[in-house]
Amino acid sequence: MKVLVIGNGGREHALAWKAAQSPLVETVFVAPGNAGTALEPALQNVAIGVTDIPALLDFAQNEKVDLTIVGPEAPLVKGVVDTFRAAGLKIFGPTAGAAQLEGSKAFTKDFLARHNIPTAEYQNFTEVEPALAYLREKGAPIVIKADGLAAGKGVIVAMTLEEAEAAVRDMLAGNAFGDAGHRIVIEEFLDGEEASFIVMVDGEHVLPMATSQDHKRVGDKDTGPNTGGMGAYSPAPVVTDEVHQRTMERIIWPTVKGMAAEGNTYTGFLYAGLMIDKQGNPKVIEFNCRFGDPETQPIMLRMKSDLVELCLAACEGKLDEKTSEWDERASLGVVMAAGGYPGDYRTGDVIHGLPLEEVADGKVFHAGTKLADDEQVVTSGGRVLCVTALGHTVAEAQKRAYALMTDIHWDDCFCRKDIGWRAIEREQN
């Protein structure tokens, strides 16, 4: 069968690479893909943008694509799933209505409140003055979020009132995030440890994926501004069996049932960003209506199940007949980024030292890369590669991932040196 993966990041390289391992599959197309997917023998890039839904549909129909897997949020919010389904094509992802769980922070917070799903206390604002009054009433630390899609960067954790007020003015009056910031959510600062809890949903049944933990801040020891994610590992030891059960009972099931009850039946990957307190009680920080990036990369490296088989079962409402199998080992991925990210960065730098053949128990996933006219791999984004490895412990996986990137370099590249530090501290204690 033929599979189409929509997207061009590290997440899509990992999903397409995994899909191509299925015995059911003869070809995996990636639209538009990157240099990594271009160089994979089993994958084929297609020059169509992720939100060009008419062109994606034409391609899928002409090529007789049997299954489409959507990577990023933008096409989901624009209704790619609705369009493909209306044309009778199999596609795994939520409808535009269901994708509001990520497309609007205010929609999500109101939904959580309606269904008594644990989350931070909050209020929505469109005007500067009432927002500032609320800030002064609540004090700092406090969290300010742009309502719409801001590529994972529309969240400010303000440690002082001055910082909070500046963020509100930037978003509501200064247009810092364009349309995404025309409405903001202000919410209480939650203390605890974060985890990424990702599941597959078929509208009614849920199949949990392996747990993971992302590293959002750009600098070591979680300093500096938020990014799309600088590295991740799986599994996340903070998600004990008990926390896993609580998350399913208090968050995932009520969300799936609540969405269905409100007429937005959810199918696709559902990613709950959790904050877990000292007592092991999870609260929802955010929902994403897709797999996380960079979490996908270490999770796919551990996945033993057939991803395509699971997606097909989900499209048919038969996820309850499936289980997922994982490598017992831990995996860890480190993002190599362009100097200046998450601010302004340069593109077009040649990347040297990429491994020429497959690596045992490791993989270099490409994100912001493209093939230049002379077939050299050059940078084309802020997050450029995710260097990922397996190990019997998180510490071993970390050591292998950093060893794998020793020879890889380009002008002004950087990475965090401490990915996995929380899990490693746990292992050492």
From Swiss-Prot:
SUPFAM superfamilies: Glutathione synthetase ATP-binding domain-like (SSF56059), PreATP-grasp domain (SSF52440), Rudiment single hybrid motif (SSF51246). Its cofactor is Mg(2+); Mn(2+). Pathway: Purine metabolism; IMP biosynthesis via de novo pathway; N(1)-(5-phospho-D-ribosyl)glycinamide from 5-phospho-alpha-D-ribose 1-diphosphate: step 2/2. One of its GO terms (molecular function) is metal ion binding. ATP binds at residues 135-196. Its EC number is 6.3.4.13. Residues 109-316 form the ATP-grasp domain. This is Phosphoribosylamine--glycine ligase. It comes from Escherichia coli O6:H1 (strain CFT073 / ATCC 700928 / UPEC).
